[in-house]
């Protein structure tokens, strides 16, 4: 069977480019630091669309820089393993790490939603101790406050940002600094890009894949920032599927990562068996 790197050299890299763009876009939609931090920051400072775009691009640039450093480091290390016999084992090890990453992302999302549902159930159970009028008023307030799923880390960051920046005037430099620091957090998807770049063994294709991932991430972050500037609440009211899409994004991204891992694993195993 044709080797993984040979498939890329024969012009089949087009499959990985749109996949990297999609992976970056889905990563930006996941409940986590980048999206929640940006939306909370823009809402807290009552930012403009221009400031939202600036914040999104700054976060993307810093995130891209981290991915590039990891990717180039991986490609430099991979040059030491040029022996053809070592490549299948590297593919197999990479596949195990990628599939483990996908499983961790899926499990983390599932556990977060389960804990959220349990808290909702406990909160609803407490309402039975109130009279009907009090239950109705409090239940209505509860719907607006907790009706949308958010993981614990994202909620903590949002509350901290609101406390620090609510109603304050900020400069463009502060916005850029906030975006740059917010994009430095590593992510499982970046690890996947690293492992794929190691398999590519080609600087041009590796750089293209990293840029593609960053492009997808930029599209999501800028869109989220602009959406926060023009009121995310209005978007959610007009399109009921917005919140559902955001909640399901981690499942799609974990599935995509898992498929990449399986693909690598199959080729690595076939190479070892030859």
Curated annotation (Swiss-Prot):
Gene Ontology, cellular component aspect: plasma membrane
Induction trigger: By nickel and cobalt. Transcriptionally repressed by RcnR.
Region listing for Disordered, in residue ranges: 127-153
Highest taxon above the source species: Bacteria
Keywords: Cell inner membrane, Cell membrane, Cobalt, Cobalt transport, Ion transport, Membrane, Nickel, Nickel transport, Transmembrane, Transmembrane helix, Transport
GO aspect biological process, one term: response to cobalt ion
Comp. bias intervals (Basic and acidic residues): 127-137
Record topology, Cytoplasmic segments: 34-56, 108-174, 231-251
GO MF terms held by the record: monoatomic cation efflux transmembrane transporter activity; nickel cation transmembrane transporter activity
Keyword Transport: yes
Membrane topology: Multi-pass membrane protein
Segments crossing the lipid bilayer: 13-33, 57-77, 87-107, 175-195, 210-230, 252-272
Periplasmic side: 1-12, 78-86, 196-209, 273-274
InterPro entries: Ni/Co_transpt_high_affinity (IPR011541), NiCoT_RcnA (IPR051224)
Disulfide linkage: none
Location in or out of the cell: Cell inner membrane
The protein's role, per its UniProt record: Efflux system for nickel and cobalt.
Sequence similarity: Belongs to the NiCoT transporter (TC 2.A.52) family. RcnA subfamily.
Protein name (Swiss-Prot/TrEMBL): Nickel/cobalt efflux system RcnA
Organism per entry: Escherichia coli O1:K1 / APEC
Lineage: Bacteria, Pseudomonadati, Pseudomonadota, Gammaproteobacteria, Enterobacterales
Gene field: rcnA
